[in-house]
């Protein structure tokens, strides 16, 4: 995924996304986890921090400097503190066993390359404390709008009168679960987003996984 693309869309992203994309899921996690040091991987403009702004020490990483500028703007507006670091998910600049918890909402599907995605998840596991949990979401290949697409997709975003394209690797449930197990996570749950009501999970927009480091 091109850093330049996210730098280009950061301002418009901030304007249209003022609330967490999976708000009910994150609010439940804030109740489950209560307090601790939390890492947001691919934090973008920081909306997914909101449910955790009380009781948690917040850290966010993103490889887009412009997104981090919007995160600073967002946290100042909503009056919470987040420690923001420009870094790539495949090489997190933290020591082993630094964080109690982590979230990564719609982040890992932007990483191009099978080995790179595995490396990024290994990095996440490395910086989590033993017993620490992480909530990860990726886009599902089975959602209807992608039925005629390859698993490597370019999804448009309009900014400044032009179209730019974001890279996505579209996961199946089986592929994502297999990858998480390979990295060494214990899967606590894997399911669609809570707003999804269809009885067959395979068509959901998101795959949501709660995992634990042994």
Please name every model-derived segment.
Residues 1-35, 39, 44-91, 115, ...:
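Class I (Rossmann-like) S-adenosyl-L-methionine-dependent methyltransferase catalytic domain
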Residues 96, 114-118:
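Conserved strand-to-helix beginnings and helix N-cap segments that scaffold or border functional pockets
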Residues 4, 106, 119:
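Active-site phosphate/pyrophosphate-handling residues
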Residues 118-130:
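A short glycine-rich, Lys/Arg-flanked "PGG" loop and its adjoining helix->strand segment in the class I
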Residues 101-115:
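A short SAM/SAH-binding and catalytic strip from SAM-dependent methyltransferases
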Residues 90-102:
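A short acidic, Gly/Pro-enriched loop at the edge of an enzyme's catalytic core
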Residues 73-76, 100, 104:
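Short, amphipathic alpha-helix enriched in basic
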